[in-house]
């Protein structure tokens, strides 16, 4: 911490599969244990839970697919069909439980909307060329709406990459929609395209 003067928030990104390994099984310790280290040092934490990672077979728990959620195989990993009703139902239930635990917690600076696209950053530019599926604005809105439904006190943020790879962020329909819902923007850099 001493190497980063002014550091106020530590950001944790984890796959959904790590946090909910079974339908009725929650492993909150994977968030809480590292978070406590920073909270005890007077810092806050922020979370992004992802559905797709390219460093593991499935960011989405396998039980979601066994329940009937559709997916695509992409270079050795699975990408969920983000507008699949089963996927959305399981995500809705997960977010309800996550919000019950973290919404309004003063140690949580923000929650990053993360269940869409690679690394939860909203882009599918790496996967669409493989399987040919493109998700539109309505799918992105559904994901945003699920988060807004459950997180009413803690600030929600969204990656500017939801606008699309190399797309202008200013007045992008999905960014405008997110902002209209009280969601703020986040970027891995200094908000540059």
Show the residue positions of the predicted features.
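An active-site-proximal structural segment forming one wall of the substrate-binding cleft
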Residues: 34-45, 68-112, 136-150
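N-terminal substrate-binding region of glycoside hydrolase catalytic domains
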Residues: 1-86
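Short, flexible loop/turn elements at secondary-structure junctions
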Residues: 14-18, 23, 49-53, 106, ...
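Catalytic-core regions of glycoside hydrolase
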Residues: 1-2, 8, 39-43, 112-120, ...
